[in-house]
Curated annotation (Swiss-Prot):
Pfam families: DnaB, DnaB_C. Belongs to the helicase family. DnaB subfamily. This is Replicative DNA helicase. Residues 164-436 form the SF4 helicase domain. It comes from Salmonella phage P22 (Bacteriophage P22). Disulfide bonds: none annotated. The keyword Cytoplasm does not apply. Keywords: ATP-binding, DNA replication, DNA-binding, Early protein, Helicase, Hydrolase, Isomerase, Nucleotide-binding. Residues 355-375 are annotated as: Disordered. ATP binds at A195, R196, P197, G198, M199, G200, K201, T202. Renders P22 DNA replication independent of a functional dnaB gene of the host.
Length: 458
C-alpha cells in the first residue's frame, strides 16, 4: 500500500509536469519521506530539475537517476493513470513519514528508558520529549491570499471589538496606563520584560499574570489561564510572591509568620483565596530547552483551551542549543518563542537580563541596546518593556518610591513610560503626573549613587 502511494506521487509528478500543484508538493515534501529508495532518488532528481530548469521531464529524470533506476522510473510514469490526486497522495506520504519517525524514535528509546538507572532513564525520557517535539510535522500548503479576502475577516474582528468594548481581543495586563500605551497584547506577540537585577522583573511579570487570570474570556464566562515556566524560583516561592502581592505585604513578613498580627493573617487568607481561584499553572524546572517549553505548552493548550498567556522566567535560564556562538543560541531561543506564540495564538512573555554596560552610564535608564547577548531579542520581540527604579542606586532620591515601566518597543502602538509606586516589593498604581514630575526632576549626583541598594527584590 505504501509503495503504491509513493509511486502515485512520483508518477503524478512525471506525467503532470511542473503545475502549481506539483510546485506545492515539491515545496512541502522532503525526499526522506519516501521509504522506497527508488522513489526517494526520483523525488530528489525531480525537485532538483524543477528548481534548476523550471520543468519536469520524465526522460531527463530517468537518465539522471542512472542505470539502476532508469527503467523503473519510466515504468512508474507509465503505470500512473492520472495526476489528479497528487496533493492527496503527497499528504499521505508525509503522514506516513512522520509515523515512521515517531515509531523509530520510540524503538530507539525503549531500552534506555526501561532498563536504565533512575537518572539514565530520566535523561532518556527528557531526550524523548525533546526529539519528539523536533520531528517536523508535514507542512501545510502555503499560498498567497488576496487582501480583499482578508478584509472580510478583519471586518469580523472590528465587529467583535465593537461588541466586546474594553474586553477586546487584545490581552490586557491589568495595569491600565500600560494597556493604554500598548493597546494590550495581541494573540501572537512575544513580549520581553528586561531590567538589571533588583528592579522587579519577576514581580511585574506576576502582577501581569494575575491581571490576565482575573479577567474572563469575552462571551464565554470562563476565566483566562496562565502558564508560568519558573526556572529561577520554585513553585512555592511563586505562590509566596503571589500571596504577598495580593495582601500588599513584604515577602519577608511571610518568612517570619510568628511576628504576624491578626490583620496580617487575614491578608494571608485573603491572598490564598484569590490565588486559588485563578487558573494559573506553574512549571517548576531549573533547566528546560525551548523545545520542551513548546511541547509542554502545546499539551497544556489542548487540555486547557482557555490558556491566554505563557510566561518564561527567564530567557537566560532556558537551556541553550549547541551553537558556535552564544548569540546564535539566544537567537534560536528568541525566534522559537516568537514562533510558539504565533503557532499557538497565545502571547508569550519572557524575562531577560540587561548588559552590565548600563551601570557605566550617568543615566542608567535602560535602552534596547542594553539587551544582553543578542540583537535578535530586539528583532523578534513585538514589545519590549524595561524597568528602572531610582531606589536601586539612590535610596535617598525623591524618585526612590517610584518604578518606571518603560515601553521601548511596540510594534503595534506607541512608546512611553508608566509610573508605579514600589511598596513592600510590589507595584502599586499612583498619580501619573505627580510621579512623572518627580522622576523627571530627580537627577542625583553620580557620586551619591550606590551600585545596588540593600535588600532590593529581584
Amino acid at each position: 500500500m505504501r509503495q503504491d502511494i509513493e509511486a502515485s506521487v512520483i508518477g503524478g509528478l512525471l506525467i503532470g509536469g511542473l503545475t502549481p500543484t506539483a510546485s506545492d508538493v515539491l515545496a512541502t515534501l522532503e525526499p526522506e519521506a519516501f521509504s522506497i529508495p527508488l522513489y526517494r532518488k526520483a523525488f530528489e532528481v525531480i525537485r532538483k530539475q524543477a528548481r534548476n530548469r523550471n520543468l519536469i521531464d520524465g526522460l531527463m529524470v530517468a537518465e539522471e537517476c542512472g542505470d539502476e533506476y532508469a527503467t523503473a522510473v519510466m515504468m512508474t510514469a507509465r503505470s500512473c493513470p492520472s495526476a489528479a490526486n497528487l496533493k492527496g497522495y503527497a499528504g499521505m506520504v508525509a503522514d506516513s513519514y512522520q509515523r515512521r519517525q515517531v515509531l523509530q524514535l520510540l524503538d530507539e528509546m525503549r531500552e534506555p528508558i526501561s532498563n536504565g538507572t533512575l537518572d539514565a532513564s530520566g535523561r532518556a525520557m527528557d531526550e524523548l520529549v525533546k526529539r519528539l517535539s523536533s520531528i517536523r510535522k508535514p507542512r501545510n500548503e502555503v499560498k498567497p491570499v488576496r487582501l480583499g479576502e482578508i478584509i472580510n475577516d478583519y471586518t469580523d474582528t472590528l465587529d467583535r471589538r465593537l461588541r466586546n468594548g474594553e474586553e477586546s481581543d487584545t490581552l490586557k495586563t491589568g495595569i491600565e496606563e500600560l494597556d493604554a500605551i500598548t493597546g494590550g497584547m495581541n494573540a501572537e506577540d512575544l513580549v520581553i520584560i528586561a531590567a538589571r537585577p533588583g528592579m522587579g522583573k519577576t514581580e511585574l511579570a506576576l502582577k501581569i499574570a494575575e491581571g490576565v487570570a482575573s479577567r474572563v474570556i469575552p462571551g464565554s464566562g470562563v476565566r483566562r489561564g496562565v502558564l508560568i515556566f519558573s526556572m529561577e524560583m520554585s513553585a512555592i516561592q511563586v505562590v509566596e510572591r503571589g500571596i504577598a502581592g495580593a495582601g500588599m505585604m513584604s515577602v519577608s513578613v511571610l518568612r517570619n509568620p510568628s511576628r504576624m498580627d491578626d490583620e496580617g493573617w487575614a491578608r494571608v487568607a485573603s491572598g490564598m483565596k484569590l490565588l486559588a481561584e485563578l487558573d494559573v499553572w506553574v512549571v517548576d524546572a531549573s533547566r528546560l530547552s525551548v523545545e520542551e517549553i513548546r511541547s509542554i505548552s502545546e499539551r497544556h493548550k489542548q487540555e486547557h483551551p482557555n490558556l491566554s498567556l505563557i510566561m518564561a522566567d527567564y530567557l537566560g535560564l532556558i537551556e541553550k542549543p549547541k551553537a558556535e556562538r552564544n548569540d546564535l543560541a539566544i537567537a534560536h531561543i528568541s525566534g522559537s518563542l516568537k514562533a510558539m506564540a504565533k503557532d499557538l495564538k497565545t502571547p508569550v512573555i519572557s524575562l531577560s537580563q540587561l548588559s552590565r554596560d548600563v551601570e557605566k552610564r550617568p543615566n542608567k535608564r535602560p535602552t534596547n541596546a542594553d539587551l544582553r547577548d543578542s540583537g535578535s531579542i530586539e528583532q523578534d520581540a513585538d514589545s519590549i518593556i524595561m524597568l528602572y527604579r531610582e531606589a536601586v542606586y539612590d535610596e535617598n532620591s525623591s524618585a526612590a518610591p517610584f518604578a518606571e515601566i518603560i515601553v521601548t518597543k511596540n510594534r503595534f502602538g506607541s512608546l512611553g513610560t508608566v509610573y508605579q509606586r514600589f511598596c513592600n516589593g510590589h507595584f502599586v498604581a499612583c498619580d501619573q503626573d505627580e510621579a512623572r514630575q518627580i522622576c523627571t526632576a530627580s537627577n542625583a549626583p553620580a557620586g551619591r549613587r550606590k551600585r545596588y541598594a540593600q535588600g532590593a527584590d529581584v
